[in-house]
Regions:
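A short, structured surface patch at a secondary-structure boundary
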Residues: 1-33, 133-136, 235-236, 240-287
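Short acidic active-site motifs
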Residues: 14-18, 36-37, 69, 145-149, ...
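Short secondary-structure boundary segments
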Residues: 31-32, 53, 108, 140-142, ...
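A ligand-binding cleft/hinge motif common to bilobed small-molecule-binding domains
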Residues: 33-43, 152, 157-177, 287-297
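Extracytoplasmic ligand-binding site segments that recognize negatively charged/polar headgroups
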Residues: 36, 49-66, 99-123, 240, ...
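Structured C-terminal subdomain patch of bacterial secreted/periplasmic proteins
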Residues: 59-78, 82, 89-92, 160-226, ...
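Basic- and aromatic-lined ligand-binding clefts that recognize polyanionic substrates
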Residues: 76-131, 232-256, 319, 323-335
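His/Asp/Glu-enriched short active-site or ligand-binding loop at hydrolase and phosphoryl-transfer sites
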Residues: 118-143, 184-187, 261-266
């Protein structure tokens, strides 16, 4: 886990002494890394691989491949790039019949020190465009933007991080924007856009779902009838708890957003599961008749799935009301 990795400071202010104490074979650095830090590493005989900001997604793919080669993980890097490209294809397919893209404004900074956004020559502009957004700042270069022009162009959507949402929506003159008045201010983890890497493709998917909800599966309308083996269950509402009977199922539930990313799998006996009384059990192998009877007596539905089957993913999306994410995961699995 990332939390267990030793911290050596920030990207622009690294603790070189601590870094050297870890005896790295290679240091990956962005352009924020100071020349002095590079010199200290060079003097200590530690090679540094600079990762420059790329202009488009193709450049990001190349960067990931380069890192994979540098750390002898070419196969993993290739898999990562393939998954990113598949997600980009997924968005392109879902937006194929869109006639007109909504106008959008990406908030980098706002307020008394000026307005900042992603101009047409920035990497973020490419992400907004790939997600089916018409960036109102695409006709300017760099990051600085005019408040007057923002008000004049009055975008349909405003995209920002959750930290800035309340302040932006309650500060004049932004309160006059149609997006603020109509509730089309959308939040996203802006690191997914600003920091180049595998999550850029996830940002495109998430933004596309915000800007074009009509192109993606809608929320589940309960009740949902689900057939599992010879049994049919009537799911009245979104299950509030779930037990995954295997690590493979657990990982799939993570993928579609049912289980949190930092959760860890724990194998439990049928008796312990029954005592905990989850709303539903998801399994990829049949329980014995005796075990199944215990779940039936406790009124706990057991849904049998094939973790590698894309139709199974769609079904789980319906059960847990995460249809859009399940649709994406199913597309990637089928690719």
């Amino acid at each position: 886990a990332v939390s267990e990795v030793e911290s050596v400071g920030s990207i622009s202010n690294a603790d070189i002494e601590k870094l050297l104490s870890l005896e790295p074979d290679l240091v990956l650095a962005s352009t924020h890394f100071s020349d002095d830090a590079v010199k200290q590493l060079d003097d200590a005989g530690v090679p540094v691989l600079y990762l420059y900001d790329e202009g488009d997604m193709e450049g990001v793919y190349d960067m990931i491949s380069l890192v994979g080669e540098a750390v002898n993980c070419e196969e993993a890097a290739e898999k990562t790039v393939d998954e990113m490209q598949t997600k980009m294809d997924y968005v392109s397919d879902r937006l194929a019949n869109v006639d007109e893209n909504p106008t959008v404004y990406y908030v980098v900074g706002y307020g008394e020190y000026g307005d900042y956004t992603a101009g047409g020559d920035t990497f973020v502009n490419g992400i907004l465009t790939a997600a089916g957004g018409d960036n109102i700042a695409s006709d300017v270069e760099g990051w600085s933007y005019s408040t007057e022009t923002l008000l004049e162009k009055d975008p349909q959507y405003v995209i920002l991080n959750a930290y800035n949402e309340e302040g932006f929506c309650t500060t004049d003159p932004y309160t006059e924007l149609s997006a603020v008045k109509n509730g089309f201010v959308e939040t996203i983890d802006t690191n997914m856009l600003d920091r180049q890497g595998p999550r850029n493709a996830d940002a495109v998917v998430e933004l596309a779902q915000m800007l074009h909800p009509e192109c993606f599966p809608s929320e589940t309308e309960y009740p949902v009838n689900v057939k599992s083996g010879v049994v049919e269950y009537n799911i009245e509402s979104c299950p509030e708890s779930v037990y995954a009977a295997s690590e493979e199922v657990f990982d799939l539930l993570k993928e579609i957003g049912v289980v949190s990313e930092d959760a860890e799998y724990e194998q439990k006996s049928v008796e312990d599961v029954v005592l905990e009384a989850p709303a539903v059990v998801v399994a990829d192998a049949e329980y014995s008749a005796e075990e199944k009877a215990k779940f039936d007596d406790a009124n706990i539905p057991v849904i049998y799935v094939d973790a590698e089957d894309d139709e199974t993913v769609i079904t789980l999306g319906q059960i847990f009301n995460c249809n859009a994410k399940a649709d994406e995961v199913a597309y990637v699995k089928a690719a």
